[in-house]
Amino acid sequence: MELFSFSILYACLCLSLFYQPARTQQAYINGSTLWNCSGNPATSKGYLCDASVKSCEAFVTFRSRAPHDTAISIAYLLGSEASKIASINKVSASDKIPSNKLIVVPVSCSCSGNIFQHYSPYTVIKNDTYFKTANDTYQGLTTCQAMIGQNYYDPENIPVGAVLTVPVRCACPSENQTADGITSR
């Protein structure tokens, strides 16, 4: 019995030598954050910067939907380059992309404060709200909390024609991730 207890203890000790805690890079936003613009959780602002990496070329994904259904219109909305979008996705810059097709969009991602973001200007149209712009127009690539934090317009009264700064969520791989072969391209 003593030998059995010692064997169990020895096995546990050996296994503990191989223990490596998982280190997650980011927290993900949950449904209540997406549907509630009045909260201000830190995770709704974007992904935290790694102290050693300040910027990178990254990408986001976007589903083509009218009026954002050409490489040109998607580039204009997301502050990217139509020629790069067209090349990556093997489409023409000006041809209509089939509705709901997932498009890879290259963006310049940089650390602003302690959050990775890509900034894109957006001109407000009638009936726009931060919530509608974040969730419908930008398809969740930003949050209404991040937009409210970045712009000075009253959330209940954004004037038509106002140009908003949209902080698009992006992230760059850490040095450890890059060493492991992960790239942002």
Feature names for model-found ranges:
Residues A75, K84-S87, S99-I103:
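Eukaryotic helix-linker segments that join adjacent hydrophobic helices
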Residues P167-R169:
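Soluble extramembrane regions of membrane proteins in the secretory/endomembrane system
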Residues A86-S94, I148-P155:
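Short acidic beta-strand-loop surface patches of small beta-rich interaction domains
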Residues Y28-C37, S87-V91, K96-S99:
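N-terminal V-set
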Residues S99-I103, N127, G161:
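Loop/turn positions that initiate beta-strands
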